[in-house]
A protein has these predicted regions:
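A glycine/proline-hinged amphipathic helix-loop "lid/cap" segment
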Residues: 1-49
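Alpha/beta-hydrolase superfamily serine-hydrolase fold, recognizing
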Residues: 33-182
């Protein structure tokens, strides 16, 4: 819709900062562990019972927008429905930071998460830009032979062509409920 397109454009032109949607106090009724990696927030959310599965969550937002209440709801549902731990990394965003800084922080956080939660089975989850970032993380893990490697990866509408120049992008937009050409 037109209003949605205007909101998306506003987020890219003047991205909101410190919206607080994924602070520890927002997760009512959950167990949380919050810390930071070089000034960037990381929070692990779990329930009373966990099954050993641990999702490392990379949010979408075009690499400029912070996580939203929708991301928080996804995290809460993964914890409630599947007994998973979910760790969210509030990674550096553009235009203030470069992709190099984002990769550096995400990889430091990944190492800390896997050390703090030794023995968990790790999964990587990314939506939209977070899906593209998840693929970059997998490449770094592979190239640098970092373990543990995620057991599974879930990419929800991953943004993998930042130029938006793929001639078949229109076909993909028809099948992808999150992808819009606006």
């Amino acid at each position: 819709t037109m209003k949605m397109s205007e909101n998306i454009k506003k987020n890219f032109d003047n991205p909101e900062r410190n919206n607080g949607e994924l602070r520890e106090d927002k997760f009512k009724g959950f167990i949380t562990d919050e810390w930071n990696v070089d000034g960037f927030n990381v929070i692990t959310v779990s329930g009373k019972k966990t099954n050993g599965g641990h999702v490392i969550f990379l949010h979408g937002g075009g690499y400029v927008a912070e996580a939203t209440a929708s991301h928080r709801r996804i995290i809460e549902e993964l914890v409630k429905m599947y007994g998973l731990k979910v760790t969210f990394i509030d990674y550096p965003l553009a235009p203030e930071h470069t992709y190099e800084k984002t990769h550096e922080i995400v990889m430091k956080a990944y190492r800390e998460i896997t050390i703090k939660n030794y023995g968990d089975e790790f999964y990587l989850f990314g939506d939209s830009a977070g899906g593209g970032l998840a693929l970059a993380v997998l490449q770094i893990l592979r190239d640098e032979k970092i373990i543990p490697f995620p057991k599974k990866t879930v990419l929800m509408s991953p943004w993998v062509d930042l130029t938006m120049s793929n001639p078949k992008i229109g076909e993909a937009a028809e099948r992808d409920p999150l992808l819009t050409m606006d």
